[in-house]
């Protein structure tokens, strides 16, 4: 990885983390602010992919900013790409499987946390 690319990811990640924190402070309702950042992050990731500007700016936005701002954007892009590639069953499986796994992980995490 080139130094410029690594710095771009770091700068994007710092900006994404601060933006996520700011949204949480300003909205103040967890389900609402999470939904907002997930939808906006997906939109931004899609714009970056669609624009295909490549290089350090692309990874600053996608891996850095969106990665820190939300992880949902990557999931959404991957699912859409599967569907666009004609892999509709895989896209549906990815969507349902990821959501089910995430919900199960939260449930198990809560249970494990309560047991400590």
Curated annotation (Swiss-Prot):
Compartment list: Cell membrane
Superkingdom per UniProt: Archaea
GO molecular function, one term: metal ion binding
Lipid bilayer topology: Multi-pass membrane protein
Transmembrane segments: 3-23, 43-63, 96-116
A biological process from GO: cellular detoxification of fluoride
Annotated control of activity: Na(+) is not transported, but it plays an essential structural role and its presence is essential for fluoride channel function.
Binding residues annotated for Na(+), in chain numbering: 67, 70
Pfam families noted in UniProt: CRCB
Keywords: Cell membrane, Ion channel, Ion transport, Membrane, Metal-binding, Sodium, Transmembrane, Transmembrane helix, Transport
One Gene Ontology CC term in the entry: plasma membrane
InterPro entries: FluC
Family to which this protein belongs: Belongs to the fluoride channel Fluc/FEX (TC 1.A.43) family.
Function summary: Fluoride-specific ion channel. Important for reducing fluoride concentration in the cell, thus reducing its toxicity.
Protein's recorded name: Fluoride-specific ion channel FluC 2
Organism (species): Natronomonas pharaonis (strain ATCC 35678 / DSM 2160 / CIP 103997 / JCM 8858 / NBRC 14720 / NCIMB 2260 / Gabara)
Gene name tied to this protein: fluC2
